[in-house]
């Protein structure tokens, strides 16, 4: 296959057109693609590398590490203008240095210019070009250049094959990469460790981690010795995809094969275990790592601290902070930010504030994430003045509030029924150059809907659309809910109809908002019809949806339909829960149907659900008025309901 590909593409090699350089290049780089006369008329005085007293040989020997694009162009121009012309070896040194700085397009442009000046490409030049084409995701040109190598009578070496393999893997063409290895062997080239590592990395990039493990094992069976680079991508993918048990097995296999381990490998698995919630296993591996002489670094500690904090074990996270300080490992802004956020979520604002002071005393500047965590904590406790003070501190320390900061504050104002203050802050945002996003508008629209100021909410929604801030499903849920709750069902239905015709993916929640609105407007039959049509629309019903519909039917005196839906719910495989039973029991008691209520109580008891407070209070009131006898209360008492 590869030979056919080479034959098919080799004819392109002599006439390939250099692709356009990135538009972000400088004028000097852009001139590479201009006629030679223009190229060499350029003013050259603005590069520090272009010292007129140095020859190109001096510049080549003075070191090209990290060479900048403009300097590379200047040096290339000096070389082209020199007489006699430099050898291709000199040009290759320059091209190789530029390629190491990842300026692949520039290398290809210069190679083309060199050839146009009559300097033939060597096999090394062509191999550099193949690498650059692969890195630029232009594999057809890479294989075309491979064809040119063979037409010139050269034999491609293992390095060239490995480069092409990497190019195929980068484009997720792993099956073709495996075929290329077969052809490589047929042509007498033995795969190297780089070949193996390239294939393993390619398989992992495509999510084929099990195939990567099989490949490694087969190579070991044939006497091949993988190294730590081989296993790195496999561990990464395993841990990111939640296969931490396999990652642990692989770690043990690496130990058996005497593969060099380091703190990075352990940290990868520790991170995976933390994300899987296996914190004790993560901590045990952390201790094992220390025992085996691998010193944990800031990344390892931050990973563990983050894992403990995400699981609500802030105290263990705090202990790790003290441990790392004791070991002379300096915590950074990530360490403190994770802990502060954890304390805030636990409602421990005082401790969070103390940590903020400690990090500042250590000379660690809090970032926006740190401040936002504290501001959010104050807002959630309705301590808005302290939240504003934290914003002032943030600004005084040179840390600008971002969109998240404003969204947190606006939400705090809305929750505290200070909607107008939230709107004022929203206007201030734009003056500071902070652009509102969907969350900003959603928060304000919901705030005004809940406060009954529907007209303001609608204007904000219109402003959101006019400013090209795309509403999401949450935006429409908020607006539709606000319209329905404020008696504007027809407007809600009009908007809902447009949404249904759009490409937006609708969930059960948005339909239940409309159903609730229909029931509130005494359009129970319409609500029932819409609910029954949902499966036909491909919308999956859940227990919550059934409970809402049953509750609405009971509230609107459609108890017979509620009973039908209750039985259908069970038939469809949705088990009734505590809420379902209590809704129906109260509805039947209110309809003077104690017999059905008693049957439902027995069924509820057998399912292990208790009567809720509302049901118990209703029974007590009916007992007091003589509508029920005491045996009914005795039956309820066995459901473990609290009478408090």
Curated annotation (Swiss-Prot):
InterPro entries documented for this protein: Pentatricopeptide_rpt, TPR-like_helical_dom_sf
Alphabetical list of Pfam families matching this protein: PPR, PPR_1, PPR_2
Transmembrane annotation, as ranges: none
Keyword Transit peptide: yes
Presequence range in chain numbering: 1-53
Position of the signal peptide: none
PPR repeats: from-to residues: 87-121, 122-156, 157-191, 192-226, 227-261, 262-296, 297-331, 332-366, 367-401, 402-436, 437-471, 472-506, 507-541, 542-576, 577-611
Keyword check for Transit peptide: yes
Entry keyword set: Mitochondrion, Repeat, Transit peptide
Intrachain S-S bonds: none
Single GO cellular component term: mitochondrion
Location of this chain's protein in the cell: Mitochondrion
Family affiliation: Belongs to the PPR family. P subfamily.
PANTHER family per UniProt: PENTATRICOPEPTIDE REPEAT-CONTAINING PROTEIN 3, MITOCHONDRIAL
Protein's name according to its UniProt entry: Pentatricopeptide repeat-containing protein At1g12775, mitochondrial
Organism this protein belongs to: Arabidopsis thaliana
